[in-house]
Amino acid sequence: MSKEELLFCPLGGSGQIGGNMNLYAYGKEEDQKWIIVDTGVSFADDSIPGIDLIYPDPGFIIDKKDDLLGIVLTHAHEDHIGAISHVWPDLKCKIFATPFTAVLITEKFKEKKIDITQHLKIVQLNGKIKLGPFDIEFVTLTHSILEPTV
């Protein structure tokens, strides 16, 4: 019988600026529950002609979407939310965001004619949520955009 463990799987953004997408899992190997923290993009430069946006491949978590509890967005910079409307249609899970971030991602989905009203959960600054085994607090900090959290 396996014991419970916490896993961290960075799909993008670790050790670089841009493309932030981190996965966390908790539980026994045969019953792990997952969350995604941020779904960001990076911006291509002239070295990749014809490419505008780059974001992490979500294939790993798409394969585990039945055990995915939701996406938690830390703040509204593009390197943290820019891929949400590209990634979410394959996941169709709950999205947790502060009010300002929620407004911006709602507009991203409107551009793609996707209504996320039923899936979007607004969390106030310093608010707390529980997703399965995860207790998450939206702790505020100083940053260059409204309502940043960690």
What are the residue ranges of the model-derived segments?
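His/Asp/Glu-rich metal-coordinating catalytic cores
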Residues: 1-72, 77-150
